[in-house]
Regions:
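Mixed-charge, Lys/Arg-enriched low-complexity segments
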Residues: 47-101
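Negatively charged, low-complexity tracts enriched in Asp/Glu with abundant Ser/Thr
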Residues: 1-21
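Short aromatic-glycine-(Arg/Gly/Cys) micro-motifs in beta-strand/loop hairpins
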Residues: 22-52
């Protein structure tokens, strides 16, 4: 099983009726000061171009993995650990976005 602050990627297996344009999912572990990690499930229309459809915050990794399996049919064996370059690319995108809007 991945480490508690995992950064995981998987392609969607099942097209969602509610979000048919989503093709890939990233679960991005974020450290919280004086608390455990949280997990941002990021839905991508185009992962290579970082075209994000939306996201959802989970307090636990298991909860995020279960949601991805339920919504998109992603199995535990479908996930891969992201490379450091991928992590930095996503981290920069999160850090540079206007989260207060």
């Amino acid at each position: 099983m991945p480490k508690p602050t995992s950064h995981l990627f998987a392609y969607v297996r099942t097209v969602s009726d509610f979000r048919p344009d989503v093709t890939a999912i990233v679960i991005f572990g974020l450290e919280v000061t004086n608390d455990g990690p949280v997990y941002l499930l990021i839905r991508f229309e185009d992962y290579e171009e970082l075209q994000i459809e939306g996201d959802h915050l989970f307090l636990g990794l298991d909860e995020a993995l279960e949601s991805a399996e339920f919504e998109y049919g992603i199995l535990p064996s479908d996930w891969r650990v992201m490379t450091e370059a991928e992590i930095q690319r996503i981290d920069w995108n999160i850090s540079s976005s206007d989260l207060s809007a």
